């Protein structure tokens, strides 16, 4: 490089250094640091509770774990007309957490314990609607008076399982926005249609949003239960819960009154389903009891655990221990493979919530059985057995499943257990499971029914004819050809019948073996190897148990079908699981094959707005 080039380079460097020094402030007093970030907006959380003793430990636990600075949150908590321990739980929680929050307003009302015009604790009378509107309006007024940026309404049985919910809703920048909450049915906390009289209207837009086939933040005519209002928006000043708008002529219902207020203020409600935010129970009919409500919420907790971890309980309230029992069974068996710890923990927590005592049985893992062990057990496959869908022989997984049940039958016989219940670990319980099962046991005793085995969950394979109802026993049919051994009741005599058939020397899958033993298997060649085939088998109807996952579902795992052949450890059977028909959902029944309508559950107290 020439001397002239070097000089130009030096001058350029000097100029750059000068610019940098000027930008940093030549003198110390001219230097500055970047601005700090904005503080989180202030939020008032309004929690209204009545007879919520069963749900509060989990609902408050969710509030405890929200990812939002508690010093930016104020609490507005009201409770009234309680027949349970709701007031004491809320008082204890507020005493323990009040120093974490910016402000706490506590509005308990001890008496009266019911409204004069209500027919029961789940009946929404005119007085109750009016009172809840006044409470919501009082919370809204408090938020405005303290200049809160937002008010977040939360029902006392709505579970926020996503700790980012508040941040996510604020980020949407909407005047009124709700997180879509999941339930065990199609019900959720929004409507997609509304009639000109303000009533619910079914629309084709609802289910794609509810199923998250469409994801986003959608304009809807109604959100309720859990929602956020941005009080910084000018239009929010026109929103009110009480009194109803001067032009209001629709039904006197708090959620409809507020939806009308939004409409009059030209405020669009929005529903977001981008994430899993939380869950809510399906509401009960007006004649429901507090026991129904408690069981309904327990079922909501169980459904949460099917796809996620157990709910957090608030550490700031005293929670009494549950007292599990075996109902009237001599034993309750839970089958689980040791290496399926996630299933084990879920079922342990599930049975605890249902207050069912049980004995954990380590399942036989078929893949670990060597040929010597198989020979010592005397296991031989039923001649010419082929899987009905794939034409393959028995798998080691199916062998392990059979042995797991076989070992329980042996224990029942050896311990002389009169009546036992058997559960696998991949099932989900229907609502009111324990009470419905207790009713069944009572009816069996009253009718003096002679039985050996009763399916609690199954896949009905005979779909052409209805099954025969059992006289004198509600919700019970004579079982036809069925798959699955999710859960069943078995008598001592039934266990002995299965053992006496010597199934190990002519083994087939356990859910094929049982229909053979009650003489309803469609393949006579299989049945001909067993005699007598006099197992007295029945099934509850409607079912009390279902699988947690079906073929093709996210998270579906099969230890029976994805295995190796029983006599060839080198040949895997992990075919396309999305096409495995045996573990698919129940095939739709023809109308003439439906079991009697009178078999509907007496516990079905659900209000089904969107079911």
Swiss-Prot record:
Residues 575-611 are annotated as: Disordered. SUPFAM superfamilies: Nucleotide-diphospho-sugar transferases (SSF53448). GO terms for molecular function: procollagen galactosyltransferase activity. Its EC number is 2.4.1.50. Residues 1-24 form the signal peptide. The keyword DNA repair does not apply. It is found in: Endoplasmic reticulum lumen. Residues 575-591 have a biased composition (Basic and acidic residues). A motif (Prevents secretion from ER) lies at residues 608-611. PROSITE patterns: ER_TARGET. Glycans are attached at residues 85, 173, 312, 370, 568. GO terms for cellular component: endoplasmic reticulum lumen. It catalyses: (5R)-5-hydroxy-L-lysyl-[collagen] + UDP-alpha-D-galactose = (5R)-5-O-(beta-D-galactosyl)-5-hydroxy-L-lysyl-[collagen] + UDP + H(+). CDD domains: Glyco_tranf_GTA_type (cd00761), Glyco_transf_25 (cd06532). Its main location: endoplasmic reticulum. Keywords: Endoplasmic reticulum, Glycoprotein, Glycosyltransferase, Signal, Transferase. InterPro entries: Collagen_mod_GT25, Glyco_trans_25, Nucleotide-diphossugar_trans. Beta-galactosyltransferase that transfers beta-galactose to hydroxylysine residues of type I collagen. By acting on collagen glycosylation, facilitates the formation of collagen triple helix. This is Procollagen galactosyltransferase 1-A. It comes from Xenopus laevis (African clawed frog).
